[in-house]
Amino acid sequence: MARMYARRRGTSSSVRPYRKEAPEWSNTDATEIEKIVVDLRKDGMSTSQIGLVLRDRYAVPDVKLATGKRIGEILREKGLESEIPEDLRNLMEKALGIRKHLAENNKDVHNKRQLQIAESKVRRLVKYYVRSGRMPKGWTYKPETAEILLTR
C-alpha cells in the first residue's frame, strides 16, 4: 500500500525486539525511573527526549517494560502532561516554519504544497485527539493562534 503524501510504498526498517520483560542488564527500579522521568520533564524535556535520555544515560531500553507504564502515563499521573500532544506540537511548529518561509518567498510553490500537507496532517491529528478526549471538544487548528499556543 502506498503512502498518503508520497508516490512510494512503505520501506522496511529495523524493528524493536519483542520482549515481555526487561533485559537483566537494564535498570528496573520503577520508583527511581519515575522520579527521573519527572525530573527530566521539569527540566523542560519532551516525552521523546526523556526516552532517549533514559536509554542512553540510565540503561532503560523500554520504560513500559521496566515500570509497567508509558512515559506519558507517568506524566499524566503526576500532573505534568503537556496540554498539546508532542506529535501535534511538532507538526504545528513545522507548519508555522513553512508559513514564515512563504511570507518572505511567496512564489515558492513546492513549499506551498508542503504547507498544505503539514496542515492536513495537523487537522487529521486534531480530529483524532478531540474524538479520543485528549483535546477539548470544538478545538480547531488556526495558524494565527497556533504560534501563541506554542510559545506557552
Swiss-Prot record:
Keywords: Ribonucleoprotein, Ribosomal protein. Disulfide bonds: none annotated. The keyword Zinc-finger does not apply. GO terms for molecular function: small ribosomal subunit rRNA binding; structural constituent of ribosome. Residues 1-24 are annotated as: Disordered. The keyword Ribosomal protein applies. It comes from the Archaea. Coiled coil: none annotated. GO terms for cellular component: cytosolic small ribosomal subunit. It holds the Pfam family Ribosomal_S15. One of its GO terms (biological process) is translation. Residues 1-10 have a biased composition (Basic residues). Belongs to the universal ribosomal protein uS15 family. Part of the 30S ribosomal subunit. This is Small ribosomal subunit protein uS15. It comes from Methanoculleus marisnigri (strain ATCC 35101 / DSM 1498 / JR1). The gene is rps15.
